[in-house]
Amino acid sequence: MLEDYYPSTTSYYHGGIDDDLYTAKWGMVMTFLDLNDSSLTPFEGTHFALIGFKSDKGVYINNGRVGAVESPAAIRTQLAKFPWHLGNQVMVYDVGNIDGPNRSLEQLQNSLSKAIKRMCDLNLKPIVLGGGHETAYGHYLGLRQSLSPSDDLAVINMDAHFDLRPYDQTGPNSGTGFRQMFDDAVADKRLFKYFVLGIQEHNNNLFLFDFVAKSKGIQFLTGQDIYQMGHQKVCRAIDRFLEGQERVYLTIDMDCFSVGAAPGVSAIQSLGVDPNLAVLVLQHIAASRKLVGFDVVEVSPPHDIDNHTANLAATFIFYLVQIMAQHS
């Protein structure tokens, strides 16, 4: 039995029910699935599993604005309203949440990793609704556990921050996940391939830039780089990064976008990547056929305005699933 795991029992869709797939919405199509069901066998074809990670403990430790613990429900509510465009050949299963208010951050990350591995064993593409960006390390661990030690797994992070802070003194938090991945790779004698899109110089100290400069597998583009380059050049940079790689894990920190587009985040930004450009870049990553799982993190509903941020996060999920399904 999976620890800290609670299957979904509540629908987030409250509109009319229509049997016609031409007018169906996500909330009408999504089906509940219990990962603890021992009778399940691997699915055939391309299907997705949606799981919430109800933790912002890492945000609290990192002195951020807490509230991301509420985001899985907020994102599901927005996603449920969207039209369904994929017929009956693709399924999105809502498998529930990882939740443990009295559990440590490390315990919850470990529980998430086991749930992710279970999804992969069932041939389901994981979609994780964070939670703080501590979500990423648990998601990454689960993906790695589903692979052999020699298999590659590149990481693309759309984020204003590197999240490569050392954690030997403070312990893990929402700003250390990718340093933990880096350290795991070093211990396993693997190159950590990591590309950050949307870095803001005023949000990252010189130690982090120096660490990146000395690390062979790490690349980044600032938000200003992306603005100047346009989506086509950004996509070419991603292609170069993914050359020779078979798998990529994608994580989207909603603080990559300015407060005008994403007011409800743990760490607001005055500058940020254009969401329209982001959709084009995300679609390009999804079309690569290398994407094995993705998450959206750091939505903080108590700080949101008219669900703008939750809706934007749901929009990214919509387009990623569309393109992954069409290119499967």
Curated annotation (Swiss-Prot):
Cofactor(s) annotated in UniProt: Mn(2+)
Picking any one GO molecular function of the record gives:
formimidoylglutamase activity
Q: Name one Pfam family in it.
A: Arginase
SUPFAM superfamilies, A to Z: Arginase/deacetylase
Cite the annotated pathway: Amino-acid degradation; L-histidine degradation into L-glutamate; L-glutamate from N-formimidoyl-L-glutamate (hydrolase route): step 1/1
The enzyme's E.C. designation: 3.5.3.8
Q: What the protein does?
A: Catalyzes the conversion of N-formimidoyl-L-glutamate to L-glutamate and formamide.
Similarity-based family: Belongs to the arginase family.
Q: What is this protein called?
A: Formimidoylglutamase
Question: Which organism was this protein described from?
Answer: Streptococcus pyogenes serotype M12 (strain MGAS2096)
Gene for this chain: hutG
